[in-house]
Amino acid sequence: MLKKYLISLDKDIQRRELFFSQKNTEDFQVFSAINTMQKDWDELAAIFNIEQFKAHYFRNVTKGEIGCTLSHLSVYQKIVEDNDIAEDSYALVCEDDALFHSDFQQNLTALLSEKLEAEIILLGQSKINDFNDFDLEINYPTTFSFLCKKTGDVNYAFPYKSYFAGTVGYLIKKSAARRFIQQISQNKPFWLADDFLLFEQNFNIRNKVVRPLIVIENPVLISNLESVRGSLSNNLLKKLMKYPLKKIFAIKKNLAN
């Protein structure tokens, strides 16, 4: 049976009520998110490499971002310690602002019946308005739909490039969770929870994306992070100019794997 984890701050009762009002959520195990907002920076520096974060991302980390990373890592620890989860099996991790597509469970079941060939499967994305938003294809293209693998009502494939997709909902293999835990047993974490490019390049943890999405952030909720990350929106013309090259990269990446 698929293990499902919901990351939620203890104070966010209404968020959990909204999440659990959705169908197929009764089997989620709630993990109390690590609240870093009241900790001082010296305390945080003891458990998170603030200086390495700044060197890597060229900016200061926020307390909320540290809490987010530590919370996801703590869930990975639980996955690793769970003897009921096989090394090559997936667990589902969601945040409490997750809004599921009406056919979420049907498509999730279909996905899990496939040989997905990636350690992380991004079922959703943050800061997106719709499950099949136009920006998904323009900014984060995959290969041509007829070359994608299809199951249920969704396609899955490698994106043209791993990117910051948020952590609203994803599948992760136990073997990948173990790799994260091995990393932090040697050095303090310094990364953002959704730096999938770093995970691919440094930890050899690959990810695939699902199109259309089956999870998005609930639009009635506002993120707990101190600041919303993400690049400034480019105008449509600039996006369209970059699109053909991104599409070529996506096609090559999927043909090579």
UniProtKB/Swiss-Prot annotation:
Family according to the record: Belongs to the glycosyltransferase 25 family.
Keywords: Glycosyltransferase, Lipopolysaccharide biosynthesis, Transferase
Organism name: Haemophilus influenzae (strain ATCC 51907 / DSM 11121 / KW20 / Rd)
Domain of life: Bacteria
EC number from the UniProt entry: 2.-.-.-
Biological process (GO), any one: lipopolysaccharide biosynthetic process
GO molecular function: glycosyltransferase activity
Pfam families the UniProt entry points to: Glyco_transf_25
UniProt-recorded name of the protein: Lsg locus putative protein 4
Enzyme class: transferase
CDD domains attached to this UniProt entry: Glyco_transf_25 (cd06532)
